C-alpha cells in the first residue's frame, strides 16, 4: 500500500507580496492609530519593538525573557511586545531573534516603533538589514514607525512598498517625505487634523500615485 507524505513547506517563498509599511509622522499624527487599524493584534504571530508601550500585547521587559519566549515558540504562535532600553545592541538582538523564527508558512507581523532611536543613517545595521531586506520572503510583514524619516536608514525606505505620511513639523522631514512620495513639500503640509476626531495622511502604494486619506475616530 502506497503512503504519501505531506510536503514540507519551504521556509522561504519569493512569491510572497511586499506588504511592508513605513509609517511616518510627528507625535499625534495618527501613526499608532493607523497601525492598529491595519494589524490584526489577535493574530497568531505578532511581535513589536515597543519602547513606549503603545500596543496591547503581552509585555516582555528583557532581552533574556524575549529570547526564552522565541526559543519556546519556534515557528509556532507568538504574540508579545518587547519594552527595553532603545539601544542599537538591544534592537539588533531583537531583529536577530525575530528573523530566526520567520517562516513563509507562518506569516508574522513585526512592528518597530520609533526606528530613528536605534537606526543608523544610510545603511542598516546587520541584523536589522537582514530582517528588512529578506523578511518578506520569510513571511514577515513590517510596520516601521518614526517621527524622523531623515534620521533612519535608507534600506528600510527602499524595502517598504507602502508609505504612510502624517503631519510633520520640520523642514528636513518634509523634504525627506516629499522625495519618497513624489509630492511637493507644500502638499506634504496640507493635512487637516482635528483632535479626537480625525487625522489626515498621505499613502503611497508602490508605483501608484500618492493619495490623501482620512482616518476618523468614533
From Swiss-Prot:
Gene3D superfamilies per record: P-loop containing nucleotide triphosphate hydrolases (3.40.50.300)
Could you tell me which SUPFAM superfamilies the record lists for this protein? P-loop containing nucleoside triphosphate hydrolases
Q: Which domain of life is it from?
A: Viruses
List the subcellular locations: Virion membrane
State the UniProt keywords alphabetically: Capsid inner membrane protein, Membrane, Virion
Matching entries from InterPro entries are given as: P-loop_NTPase, T4SS_component
Keyword Membrane on entry: yes
Can you quote a single GO CC term?
Answer: virion membrane
Name assigned to this protein: Protein P9
Organism for this UniProt entry: Pseudoalteromonas phage PM2
Amino acid at each position: 500500500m502506497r503512503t504519501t507524505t505531506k510536503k514540507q513547506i519551504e521556509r522561504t517563498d519569493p512569491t510572497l507580496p511586499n506588504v511592508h509599511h513605513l509609517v511616518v509622522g510627528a507625535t499625534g499624527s495618527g501613526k499608532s492609530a493607523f497601525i492598529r487599524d491595519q494589524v490584526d493584534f489577535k493574530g497568531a504571530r505578532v511581535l513589536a519593538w515597543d519602547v513606549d508601550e503603545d500596543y496591547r500585547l503581552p509585555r516582555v521587559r528583557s532581552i533574556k525573557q524575549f529570547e526564552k519566549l522565541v526559543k519556546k515558540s519556534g515557528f509556532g504562535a507568538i504574540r508579545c511586545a518587547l519594552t527595553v532600553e532603545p539601544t542599537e545592541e538591544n534592537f539588533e538582538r531583537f531583529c536577530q531573534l525575530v528573523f530566526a523564527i520567520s517562516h513563509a508558512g507562518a506569516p508574522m507581523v513585526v512592528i518597530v516603533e520609533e526606528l530613528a532611536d536605534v537606526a543608523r543613517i544610510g545603511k542598516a545595521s546587520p541584523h536589522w538589514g537582514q530582517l528588512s531586506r529578506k523578511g518578506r520572503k520569510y513571511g514577515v510583514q513590517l510596520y516601521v514607525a518614526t517621527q524622523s524619516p531623515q534620521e533612519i536608514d535608507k534600506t528600510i525606505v527602499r524595502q517598504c512598498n507602502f508609505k504612510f505620511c502624517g503631519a510633520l513639523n520640520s523642514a528636513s522631514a518634509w523634504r525627506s517625505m516629499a522625495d519618497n512620495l513624489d509630492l511637493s513639500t507644500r502638499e506634504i503640509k496640507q493635512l487637516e487634523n482635528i483632535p479626537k476626531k480625525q487625522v489626515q495622511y498621505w499613502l503611497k502604494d508602490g508605483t501608484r500615485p500618492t493619495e490623501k486619506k482620512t482616518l476618523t475616530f468614533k
